[in-house]
Swiss-Prot record:
Uppermost EC category: ligase
Keywords in alphabetical order: Aminoacyl-tRNA synthetase, ATP-binding, Cytoplasm, Ligase, Nucleotide-binding, Protein biosynthesis
Residues binding L-serine: T230, A231, E232, E284, S384
SUPFAM superfamilies per UniProt: Class II aaRS and biotin synthetases, tRNA-binding arm
Domain text: Consists of two distinct domains, a catalytic core and a N-terminal extension that is involved in tRNA binding.
Keyword Endoplasmic reticulum carried by entry: no
Protein name: Serine--tRNA ligase
Enzyme Commission number, as recorded: 6.1.1.11
Gene giving rise to this polypeptide: serS
Length: 425
């Protein structure tokens, strides 16, 4: 959530920045007008309350002197009625202001490229060379069926589209991948967590999913519970409403969790395979940082995600998202895209973002600065480390062999009882 004072004090510059994120001028002009009116009413309210206090003192004095205080009482009643009217008007303005503020996206960092959509994202670097196959490559969904490790048909029967069963070495491969990821992040100082898989609406508001993106989630009817779309939500809200000791920062969390997404706007996209599911596993990284350190922490987080891909020997590239393609809460985002041979392209496997104080303001997560003793908003960061299903897809396609088998990456073999290859059924 943005700071109204910051918008007020730097309106023109921030309006330009928010325009690059699709915020129309009329919205910000309405916010400005409401803010001006609100401050005018607050001044008037304070003046009237001062008059009421004086009138109250005059009434008390008159009563002590056994004088008629009817005029003072009438005057005070009139002032009190005016105050009540102003308070009602202020409440209505506050509601309108809040409705606008909670739907405004974060302000992009100056280093973020300006652009309308993914076509204007900027490539930062690449790692690894895509393998040159001397046979026709199969898509991971075909490989999974041929190997007997992914069952789409029964997933659809039991639940519906975009669901599947992992089976045998497929289930073991997925488990090996996320255990490997968690172990690697633990080496980098992340505290491993097991979170609730349901959160309340306040938590969804805190990280920016609510109220704007309700349609993308699964809610439990008749309750305050929502199935988590990512472990970012419970991990970030772990400190909601708390004041941390500045000496403890930065704090690193990592967690494996299922992610539940309705994919409301994805009809017709990635209808086959592991790229876009209603339920999938993801290892998440979350950081709590002092503001002055948060961009260094973002770069470190990207390196942590890259480390997984490099140890799996999967070719990838790092992209800086432009203003028009960033997520709602992000001030800056890097995407890591892994090479998918059957599609002859790179696909997102991790997204690492610095939200600056956007989520911290919504969730009221603060710290006491040991230098001056003041309580301040901290910065929160989040990133995938990595999306597990997409990692399975990348391994199946990049490690496939001409005979239909799939070689298991070396770093995963200790997690799979020493198995080196998955053979066709």
């Amino acid at each position: 959530m943005l700071d109204v004072k910051r918008i007020r004090n730097d309106f023109d510059a921030l309006s330009e920045k928010l325009a690059t994120r699709g915020v129309v001028a009329e919205t910000l002009n309405e916010l400005k007008e409401l803010d001006v009116k609100r401050r005018e009413l607050l001044i008037k309210s304070e003046e009237l309350k001062a008059q009421r206090n004086i009138a109250s003192d005059d009434i008390a004095q008159a009563k002590r002197n056994k004088e008629d205080a009817s005029e003072q009482i009438a005057a005070m009643q009139k002032v009190s009625a005016e105050i009540k009217e102003i308070d009602a008007e202020l409440a209505a303005i506050d509601e309108k202001l809040n409705t606008i503020i909670v739907t405004l996206p974060n302000i992009p960092n100056d280093s973020v490229p300006v652009g309308a959509d993914e076509d204007e994202n900027v490539e930062v670097r690449r790692w690894g060379t895509p393998r040159d196959f001397d046979f026709e490559v199969k898509a991971h969904w075909d490989l999974g069926e041929d190997l007997g490790i992914l069952d789409w048909e029964r997933g659809a029967k039991v639940t519906g589209s975009r669901f599947l069963f992992y089976k045998g070495l497929g289930a073991r491969l997925e488990r090996a991948i996320y255990n490997f990821m968690l172990d690697e992040h633990a080496k980098e100082g992340y505290t491993e967590m097991i979170t609730p898989y349901m959160v309340n609406h306040d938590s969804m508001f805190g990280t920016g999913q609510y109220p704007k993106f309700k349609e993308d989630t699964f809610e439990l009817d008749g309750t305050d519970y929502v199935l988590i779309p990512t472990a970012e939500v419970p991990l970030t809200n772990y400190y909601r409403g708390e004041i941390l000791d500045g000496k403890e920062l930065p704090i690193y969390f990592t967690a494996l969790s299922p992610s539940f997404r309705s994919e409301a706007g994805s009809a017709g996209r990635d209808t086959r395979g592991l790229i876009r599911l209603h339920q999938f596993h993801k290892v998440e990284m979350v950081k709590f940082s002092k503001p002055e350190d948060s961009y260094d922490e973002l770069e470190k987080m990207v390196v942590n995600a890259e480390n997984i891909l490099q140890k799996l020997n999967l070719p990838y590239r790092v992209i800086t998202l432009c203003t028009g393609d960033m997520g709602f809460s992000a001030a800056k985002t890097y995407d890591l895209e892994v090479w998918i041979p059957a599609q002859n392209t790179y696909r997102e496997i991790s997204s690492c973002s610095n939200t600056e104080d956007f989520q911290a303001r919504r969730a009221q997560i603060r710290y006491r600065d040991e230098a001056d003793g003041k309580v301040k908003l901290l910065h929160t960061l989040n990133g995938s480390g990595l999306a597990v299903g997409r990692t399975v897809a990348a391994i199946l396609e990049n490690y496939q062999n001409e005979d239909g088998s799939v070689t298991i990456p070396e770093v995963l073999r200790p997690y799979m009882g020493g198995a080196e290859v998955i053979l066709p059924k």
